[in-house]
Amino acid sequence: MSSVVVVGTQWGDEGKGKITDFLSEHAEVVARYQGGNNAGHTIVFGGVKYKLHLIPSGIFYKEKICVIGNGLVVDPKALLEELKYLHDRGVSTDNLRVSNRAHVILPYHLKQDELEEASKGDNKIGTTKKGIGPAYMDKAARIGIRMADLLDREAFKEKLERNLAQKNRLFEKMYDTEGFSVEEIFEEYFEYGQQIAQYVCDTSVVLNDALDNNHRVLFEGAQGVMLDIDHGTYPFVTSSNPIAGGVTVGTGVGPAKVTRVVGVCKAYTSRVGDGPFPTELHDEIGHQIREVGREYGTTTGRPRRVGWFDSVVVRHARRVSGLTDLSLNSIDVLTGISTLKICVAYKYNGEVIDEVPANLNILAKCEPVYEELPGWTEDITGVRSLDELPENARKYVERVSELTGIQLSMFSVGPDRNQTNIVRNVYEA
């Protein structure tokens, strides 16, 4: 039995999709455990670039089972659009499995998301307006509609009628806008369910059977640790748990069955949306990193905020996710910068602190304590081993591993999968 979790160690967009795709080659099952279509990942496969938001990265390997676990919230319309996107490009999806316990995003979730975000004014969270938060709210409030309900005509209609009575009062009284009729949603979404039905099953059984038969299972996280609803920069977070612990609740696989946890990070830091960002760069170097690294959101197209590598953040991720391995991406983006900086601690009111404060007012006032390292000018995009890196690039990579306390297992020097290099095999480590 071998199972590996891929976790983002920063604010998402660390290159998890590429690393998951890379590791998928040696897995027999690939599963997502949280989030929804708010997370985008770009994958280059067979020389073609694909953008996925919901379906696991392993879908391009038709012999591998791909699972959308119970911890996700699924927009049926978006899922069908993504399936069509793949079918139109000749990609089979017969290997997809969708949990019958996954919650469903409906039109009122999308509307609620947009209205709530607009009402917050300057205090907005930076939501992608995909209905993710409201769907998780309904799940916690025990009024959510699950995939199993969507496939049951009577159950779906009964729950939809109940929910709309409540949601429409919310829209009318709080937002002074019209709600939805049952007719506007019911037939359309029931039909979506019928189109998805062939993929729906108890995915906990699928995953545990695979593990019990000594198959390699890869768990794919979305977003990142700093967007985790419990351990991230709350409230500027997502509505689920991207940390490795999310695997257990989001797939129905016990924690003892997880063997390795790979933390993925960039050689710098980026984030989309609002919230404190201690190492953020507003200068020409920041602009250079953004343009060279093509730092624009896969889902939103928004320019990402960028900054120096923050080892305080990644150490936090190591602790709360139990990281065993490090995958360092986008090292090539730093080429040509004469002096590189790594944040080793924060300074607040004259005191040096080594951990991420829970109080965001404190975090916003933290000043990064930097360690400087010399940069490099050599083209490293063709490098295939640590020894081939220029001395300064290798020292930078090694210092990141030292400061975070995580053993390096992979590093990337470009966006293509053949630019990802293995230092040690995470399935056998």
Swiss-Prot record:
InterPro entries found in the cross-reference section: Adenylosuccin_syn_GTP-bd, Adenylosuccin_syn_Lys_AS, Adenylosuccinate_synth_dom1, Adenylosuccinate_synth_dom2, Adenylosuccinate_synth_dom3, Adenylosuccinate_synthetase, P-loop_NTPase
Residues holding IMP: D13, E14, G15, K16, N38, A39, G40, H41, T128, R142, Q223, T238, R302
The keyword Metal-binding is annotated on this UniProt entry: yes
Enzyme class: ligase
Reactions catalysed, as given in the entry: IMP + L-aspartate + GTP = N(6)-(1,2-dicarboxyethyl)-AMP + GDP + phosphate + 2 H(+)
Function: Plays an important role in the de novo pathway of purine nucleotide biosynthesis. Catalyzes the first committed step in the biosynthesis of AMP from IMP.
Name of the protein in its database record: Adenylosuccinate synthetase
